[in-house]
Amino acid sequence: MVPSTFSRLKAARCLPVVLAALIFAGCGTHTPDQSTAYMQGTAQADSAFYLQQMQQSSDDTRINWQLLAIRALVKEGKTGQAVELFNQLPQELNDTQRREKTLLAAEIKLAQKDFAGAQNLLAKITPADLEQNQQARYWQAKIDASQGRPSIDLLRALIAQEPLLGAKEKQQNIDATWQALSSMTQEQANTLVINADENILQGWLDLQRVWFDNRNDPDMMKAGIADWQKRYPNNPGAKMLPTQLVNVKAFKPASTNKIALLLPLNGQAAVFGRTIQQGFEAAKNIGTQPVVAQVAAAPAADVAEQPQPQTVDGVASPAQASVSDLTGEQPAAQSVPVSAPATSTAAVSAPANPSAELKIYDTSSQPLSQILSQVQQDGASIVVGPLLKNNVEELLKSNTPLNVLALNQPENIENRVNICYFALSPEDEARDAARHIRDQGKQAPLVLIPRSSLGDRVANAFAQEWQKLGGGTVLQQKFGSTSELRAGVNGGSGIALTGSPITPRETTDSGMTTNNPTLQTTPTDDQFTNNGGRVDAVYIVATPGEIAFIKPMIAMRNGSQSGATLYASSRSAQGTAGPDFRLEMEGLQYSEIPMLAGGNLPLMQQALSAVNNDYSLARMYAMGVDAWSLANHFSQMRQVQGFEINGNTGSLTANPDCVINRKLSWLQYQQGQVVPAS
């Protein structure tokens, strides 16, 4: 019996060892699920890795790898491949996978520029149900779906996202929050309603108020920011100031005591250079006053047509256009104010400084490199010019340390801390037109442009701005010479409100439906061009002679009740317009620089007198006056976001590259008169 008992005890003692060996042996043959770490964001790889893992896995693990591959493909810009893989997802998913699928569907919509579809999908997601890394993606999707348009929802999304980010991403988040706040008008800000417990949002809105009150006074702004940081020490923006406000705190005004003015004074461009010089010197000696941005105006008595100066390629145009392309040098409708001016949003003026030393350098007489060397030796504190595009390109290559207000802009803008770019550009005018037309509630614009590089540039600028504002496809139609237009009128063909889509620079893949995200193709050109009734706005870039044919041809083909509002650039405006022309243009809206729209009547009279009533040169004169204002506020334009000057060529603001943008006045022909556009 003893041996038997011993055997049983021995067997009992060995059993756990055997079981453990079997368990460990089983573990050795089972590969752990690595997809969880990637799903939770603790590990990352590219789409090729995820696709390989997907092929080698099965069941839930395979689905996880498939979801990860879709996420990576979207991030890599391979939207079409992501959609194809998305459509292969099985219907049966667990809760975690289902939430990831919905989030991915929204991210794909964003990649396809289907912002409304993305917002619909995001509305179905409860952020609290998501993992932390998914929450960061969710809020980023909400931010992207807003398209940068400032709103209370965008601010809340940015605030919710901030705690989920690393240090580098936090600065980007804070800068984006400030961008949204500073993009609002004061009227928009006044309509915001927040909850009592939204302390962070309240702090941001108080900072916005400091900015509204002091943005044109850098010293007051500095003090206001410092006080705000003391009052809201726990606000993310107080701990890490927006980059733009850091620049404000470091603000130092630029000196204009010694100015170098670089202009062509000989050759074909001399007439423009000397006119800008006249305007600049007049402002220096007399000073400037804020201009009324929008006024009611009516045409004065008709004047005799003035000869136009010879156009010169490369003058005051950012894309090698002639001056006519740049300034629309046909005379503008002569106008006088007939109603009270609107309140200025930025009462900024540049005082006279007759004692300031001004030296003119002729860029047509010697290489720019030599001129810049001489300017530096002469001790200039700021350079205004050059005017010609090729000279601006040379300026950038020189890497000059001087502060420069260039009177043109290069093909490819370079952000230099000491350079701002101020040009009268048809592209700027097109972008302003897109904003104006969008503000009037239009949804489907057609751009009528000349068959030229000018037309292509204007169309592209308009379409880019339109889509930036959240608009959809922009159509374009090109016209030929005046003789071709005349033949069209005689033949009774007219102009149909149809066109081909302007090809965006950023290509997008086809969309997905909201309810069942599956691949769909984008509409064809025929689907766009055959829907003539869709067009509700037509932006026309034409000379007075061309538009005199174009507008009747539109009515000839579509009838006077087509429902489309017609808009035109200042290229079509003319001071010699008689009553017949004004009646023919009934209802047409057109853009014009504020000075020639009646916003500064004394200066308009002064400018026209100086240039013998030549409206094209009057625009260049106004450019010279505004150049003086910009030179006197160079540091503010360069460093203070939102700083604005109501100038004679437009309401002037600077983008982050210090390209000066111009908001123009909009006028309308009404019963033979010129009035503000409604």
Swiss-Prot record:
GO terms for biological process: peptidoglycan biosynthetic process; regulation of cell shape. The keyword Signal applies. Residues 304-338, 495-530 are annotated as: Disordered. Residues 513-529 have a biased composition (Low complexity). A lipid is attached at residue 27 (S-diacylglycerol cysteine). It is a lipid-anchor. Pfam families: LppC. One of its GO terms (cellular component) is periplasmic space. One of its GO terms (molecular function) is enzyme regulator activity. Residues 1-26 form the signal peptide. It comes from the Bacteria. It is found in: Cell outer membrane. CDD domains: PBP1_YraM_LppC_lipoprotein-like. Its main location: membrane. InterPro entries: LpoA, Lytic_TGlycosylase_superhlx_U, Peripla_BP_I, TPR-like_helical_dom_sf. The keyword Transcription does not apply. Transmembrane segments: none annotated. Keywords: Cell outer membrane, Cell shape, Lipoprotein, Membrane, Palmitate, Peptidoglycan synthesis, Signal. A lipid is attached at residue 27 (N-palmitoyl cysteine). Interacts with PBP1a. Belongs to the LpoA family. Regulator of peptidoglycan synthesis that is essential for the function of penicillin-binding protein 1A (PBP1a). This is Penicillin-binding protein activator LpoA. The gene is lpoA.
